[in-house]
Amino acid sequence: MATPTQEAIDTFMTITGSSNAVAVRKLEEYRGNLNRAVNAYFTHGDQNSYDAMDIDDGVTPVLSEARTTDPFPLRDPNFGRSLFDNDPVMSRPPFVSHPREAREIPIEVKDSNGPSGQSNDAPTIEDVTETAQAHGPAAQEAVIIDEVSDDDNQSAPTGQSRHAVPVGSAENNMQHYNDIEEQIIRAAIEASKMETGDDVTKSVTVQSAEREVLRSEGWKASSSEREASEMVSIPVQQGSRASNGRFAAPSSLSEDDDDDDDDDPDYVEEEEEPLVSHRPRRAVSGSRSSLNDDLPRSPEAEDATIHSPGAGNGFPSEWGGISSEEHDEAIMLEAAMFGGISESEYGVPYAHYPQRTQRPPSPSLTAQRLIREQQDDEYLASLEADRVKAEARRLEEEAARVEAIEEAKRKEEEARRKVEEEQELERQLVSKEASLPQEPPAGEENAITLQVRLPDGTRHGRRFFKSDKLQSLFDFIDICRVVKPNTYRLVRPYPRRAFGDGECSSTLNDIGLTSKQEALFLELI
């Protein structure tokens, strides 16, 4: 048989928290295989010392145990000890969780090592409906524990998961804090199921539930010494059914309560039936009246709870187990979102919050606001004036641009027309020059010499027949290209006579130009 190494033994002891002898024996059984030895230890455990039981949750592993340690270590007197020391926390008796209706059924513990019966290590019965826990010998019910080993769940041993913490002890306080998360989840689930007649859902957030649980746990921690000496049990009518569909069963917190129940003539034991429990949950020692107030119950039970002396620490169940501050915040949030909320929806009159009166502003603040408004108005006016000026300047520039374009077009048209006129005049002059009659010779008796003085001072002369028309003289003056046609008239100085376009068809002899030589000048019209 292989001898395990000291490193493997130390590792096994660190992981499992067992003794050196157990570590050596397990490692020798599995030939030094540390993984198989640890798995076998957590799977089978020490069967000679503990009752095997199929438990879903199992013992919290090392890391989980360290994680769920008391969050307030300064209050824990066992904080300096190791997690694996043989302290009361690691040697507490097992407990069994069962529903409310199962609490009326006797529960027996069957163990292969001995006959069933109650002992100091008897399983602690926990009510999953959050009623008070029955500890150790105080539990009158018997539980049949089905010894089925869970081979699949090898991460945690089952033999070390059944321990009970005495009420009022330091370990009980640590257990309270370890169960905060479970209480928060339960409170949130129970609150989410509650609805009003108008389908208005009142839900409890995880943060609010945590605050309330911490508040209640703080009160419990401060009064733990008083609870250790004096236990208060609330009798519950047997056979009554709560609003959540479970039977409300009596629960005892001490031996005195059990004795009282035995002496009570009205107490009737239910038919004993064996109960096989496969789903134990972690025990929560101490009173759970704060959480019982959050559970839905019958109207009579709610009225009795609300008017009972011990109901001052709980919150109304119709509000989902939330505090009055959170209830008021929810009402204000709903009023802000939906513009108001009617009191008839919940049947509870809500306190009207006084609106804060608006005080008039101070004179200096009013003057500053007035000055600022005037400055803003002046600034806006200057911006408007600048905008108007810019718009006028833009319009002027646009008009000037359009006018320049039109002027250019007009000049271009005028130049084109002038060119056309010149071209037309040139064609006319060419035609007139072609139609001008032939000049007679110098010795012709019927010929007449005409001298015309132009406006520029030059003189032009030519011989014509006396039978030629006056139009021939106008054509001769036009082809000289000094003045434009139809812009002048001929004048004879003595006797003065002017000849115009109306006499162009008359001959020279008819208009009185009969001398051999005549002098004429042009007069512009």
Curated annotation (Swiss-Prot):
Domain UBA-like: 2-44
Organism lineage string: Eukaryota, Viridiplantae, Streptophyta, Embryophyta, Tracheophyta
Keyword Phosphoprotein in annotation: yes
Biased composition (Basic and acidic residues): 209-229, 408-430
Matching SUPFAM superfamilies: UBA-like, Ubiquitin-like
Positions with biased composition (Acidic residues): 254-274
Domain UBX: 443-521
Protein name as it appears in the record: Plant UBX domain-containing protein 13
InterPro entries on file: UBA-like_sf, Ubiquitin-like_domsf, UBX_dom, UBX_domain-protein
